[in-house]
């Protein structure tokens, strides 16, 4: 089960709102003004979708929950003099999320989408995986969530309903053809070829006398760049298999040919070599060691599963966008608070 939609609805992520194309601000490119809505009574209706109202209180609770979540979890830093602007941003996001969710839930009701216990269990397992990056449990999610436990649990249920709706109407209709796979494979190969050509140019500079360590610090995409590309000392069998042959045959100080590993394209330089010492009656054998530096430019991994997964995600997002736009066109949507918001 994919929980992208669920989590997006719950947390009001920009992904969901941009994916569904809702809540566009006509004045996004216009000069900002000081015309912001003043606080209203809790029951004041700020938006309507198919007769379902969004009150100021519910909008504000969700918006301030989003703001709190971004500050505490995503470490959003909001200067004091920009706090009101931030609140307005999250109020608009709150309205957009309400529109997306309400349109989808209305259609789910029309199609009589219902949850089974297995849906909830699958959803909780998927949520648990999603939350690992936050070091949260599912209970943390519900109890520490930005809108209170009761609302978070209801939002989770609603998100599962929406996922089930989208599975029936979008995901199960996805088709990935040989041409899709061939096109993406060709695009990725072209990207990797560009990386190879770039490293060829860097290698030429090294052959012309550029300092290896300085170049590594400036261009290498590996952690070792901080140390001028130095990887340390190795014996045979203790390094990447693709490194071993050149590392133990390359002359000390020479700039080696470009080699490819699962990480990308590399240029190697052996900076020191210590010959092997045979065993004696009083001491064990000491194996040959090399000290190695490299420059890495990363490539895009190309494998069938990764490619098909990428195509599936792209087609799914496009499918959700089209599906939502069709539903939205039939819906009665009105934003009473921000007249510049269109749906």
What annotation goes with each model-predicted range?
Residues 77-86, 196-245, 260-261, 271-291, ...:
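Peptidyl-prolyl cis-trans isomerase
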Residues 53-57, 81-102, 114-121, 147-160, ...:
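Soluble non-cytosolic domains of exported or imported proteins
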Residues 18-21:
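C-terminal motif of bacterial Sec signal peptides marking the signal peptidase cleavage site
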Residues 139-187, 211, 217-222, 242-299:
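Proteostasis/folding factors centered on peptidyl-prolyl cis-trans isomerases
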Residues 41-50, 55, 109-111, 211, ...:
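Envelope-exposed proteins and targeting segments
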Residues 23-24, 32-155, 311, 315-318, ...:
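N-terminal targeting/tethering segments
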Residues 1-9:
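Bacterial N-terminal signal peptides that target proteins for export
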